[in-house]
C-alpha cells in the first residue's frame, strides 16, 4: 500500500508492505509532477494508493496514474474512530489521520500536535473520539511574517537559540520564535487538559517538521513520532480497502504494525 500525505509545504510518500512502514521520499508540494507520480505508479503496479491531501489542486497528479486503485481520505469515509464535531467536512484529512493514529496506536485521552505550515492540535477524548482541536500559525510563519511586514528585521534561520537574552537582532528573533512557541504549546496543552476535566496526565504526541526543535525541551510531550500522519493514513486505508473488497481478509500485518496492538471497529463520522 502506497501512502501519500500532501501538505501545504511538503508531500510525503510512504510504503506499507509486509507489516513494515517506510518513507519512500519527500517532495516539495509545489514541485509535484506527473513524471514523478507516474514513476511511482510504474514501480509499484500492484499497490493501492491512499491519498491524504490538504491541497486539492495537487490531487490530480496522483489520481490519473493510480486510476482504479486510489482511495481518498475525507470525513465521509469510515475512519476507525468516532468523530464528534458539528461539521466534519471542515476537518482536514491530515488532522483525521493524526487523530486515528493517536487513538488507535497511543491510546486516549490524548493530543496530537502537528508542526507544519500551520500547527494543529487534534484531541481525542476519554472515549477515543476525535472531539476538536486548535489551529495556530506555524513556527516559520512567525519569523517570515515579521520579515515581510517590517522594513529592517531580517529573515532568520530557525534553530535552537544559544541563550534567552539575545545580543543581536537575529538571535532576538530566534529566541522569540523558538522559546515563545514552546510557551504557546505548553500553555495550550494545559488548557486542553483543563477543558477536558483531566486531573492526571494525558498522552501528548508531536509530529511534523518542527516537532523535534520545539518539543525536545518540553516535558509535557511524551512522544515525537514523525511518521504519525502516515501511520494514520495506513490505518484508514486498510479500512477502505477491506470495505471495497468484502470477500478478502485483512492484508497481512493488519491491524497492528510490528509492536502495535489495539482494538478495531468500524465507525462512521456521525457515531
UniProtKB/Swiss-Prot annotation:
- What is the name listed in the Swiss-Prot or TrEMBL entry for this protein? Type III pantothenate kinase
Question: Looking at the Swiss-Prot or TrEMBL record, what is one Pfam family this protein matches?
Answer: Pan_kinase
Which purpose does this protein serve, as stated in its record?
A: Catalyzes the phosphorylation of pantothenate (Pan), the first step in CoA biosynthesis.
Q: Does the keyword Metal-binding apply?
A: yes
Which reaction is recorded as catalysed by this protein? (R)-pantothenate + ATP = (R)-4'-phosphopantothenate + ADP + H(+)
Organism equals Methylacidiphilum infernorum (isolate V4)
- Binding residue positions for ATP: 5-12, 117
Q: For this protein, what is the EC number? A: 2.7.1.33
A GO cellular component annotated for this chain's UniProt record is: cytoplasm
Look up the record and name the cofactor or cofactors this protein needs: NH4(+); K(+)
Q: How is the cofactor bound here?
A: A monovalent cation. Ammonium or potassium.
What are the disulfide bonds?
A: none
Source superkingdom: Bacteria
Q: Where is it predominantly found?
A: cytoplasm
Q: What is this protein's gene name?
A: coaX
Where is the protein localized? Cytoplasm
Give the annotated active site.
94 (proton acceptor)
Residues recorded as binding substrate, renumbered to this chain, are 85, 92-95, 169
Q: How does it assemble?
A: Homodimer.
* Family to which the UniProt record says this protein belongs: Belongs to the type III pantothenate kinase family.
BP-aspect Gene Ontology terms: coenzyme A biosynthetic process
Q: Which key words tag this protein in UniProt? A: ATP-binding, Coenzyme A biosynthesis, Cytoplasm, Kinase, Metal-binding, Nucleotide-binding, Potassium, Transferase
Q: Where does K(+) bind?
A: 114
Pathway field:
Cofactor biosynthesis; coenzyme A biosynthesis; CoA from (R)-pantothenate: step 1/5
One function term, GO molecular function aspect:
ATP binding
